[in-house]
């Protein structure tokens, strides 16, 4: 298996750090969104580790005028 990086735009889920870079939203703001909305449809939990479903979060952000 070769070691290569998948571009963010092709990933199904993003870590908090990756999502912060991709959406240009601070990690603190993303962590606050996660803690305030732990059952949001754009979140995927693996134990206590959260992943952000990129396309669903894009749709969520599209509905906002400010974050």
In which residue ranges do the predicted regions lie?
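Major-groove DNA-recognition helix of helix-turn-helix-type DNA-binding domains
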Residues: 22-51, 58, 65
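Polyanion-binding surface elements
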Residues: 2-29
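Short intrinsically disordered terminal tails
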Residues: 1-3, 63-67
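Generic detection of intrinsically disordered/low-complexity segments and helix-coil linkers/edges
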Residues: 2, 6, 16-17, 36-39, ...
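Intrinsically disordered, low-complexity segments enriched in glycine/proline and serine/threonine
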Residues: 8, 54, 58-61
């Amino acid at each position: 298996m070769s070691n290569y990086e998948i571009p963010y735009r092709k990933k199904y889920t993003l870590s908090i750090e990756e999502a912060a870079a991709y959406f240009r939203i601070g990690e603190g703001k993303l962590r606050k969104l996660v803690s305030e909305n732990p059952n949001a449809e754009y979140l995927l939990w693996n134990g206590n580790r959260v992943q952000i479903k990129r396309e669903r979060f894009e749709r969520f952000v599209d509905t906002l005028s400010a974050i």
